[in-house]
Amino acid sequence: MKPVKTITKHNWFLRLIKKIIRTVRVTPKLAFNQENLPEKAIYIANHSGAAGPLTLSVYFPKYLVPWGAYPMTENYFRRWKYLYYVFYRQKIGYGKIRSFFLATLFGIISKTLYNGVKLIPTYPDARLKTSIRKSIEHLEVNNSLLIFPEDSSGGYKEEIETFHSGFVFLANKYYQEKQVHIPIIPLFYHKAS
């Protein structure tokens, strides 16, 4: 496995996508304390449908390595199944035709996008240890993490109602191993902003 390196910018493909988005979209309001952003931190944010991760990746002034659903790092068919059945149908609430179309298109480019942002896959089982280890490696080279902790099994909400505690476990594990408190910083994005 390749060693984790400090990341200061996205690859050329993601920079191009970001430039296109910034050209056609009005800059949204992101709620966070812009003063004294730490060198490395765990940023937690609401997903806000499909828009949250993309918006934060494009407009946040710091490079963030996101946690994400593990099926999105697998082969095309598994990505498509996750996108169609879980992401678009269950979480976003789209109809069958729209979900099929979007899952088919996004399934094609998603692997390239997620590899470009160095997505750390998260798991609902013992493999989460791999996610924690990879996260600590990123923090050790001063890469900040972006985690969407909300429980989205009933769909995405504008405000987080309940959340998974993986980010707290990660912060505790980091402290146990490194004797350093890692800042946990909340971000908020509202797609109507």
Positions of predicted regions on the chain:
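Soluble catalytic domains of membrane acyltransferases
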Residues: 3, 17-193
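Helix-enriched interaction subdomains in cytosolic or periplasmic regions
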Residues: 1-13
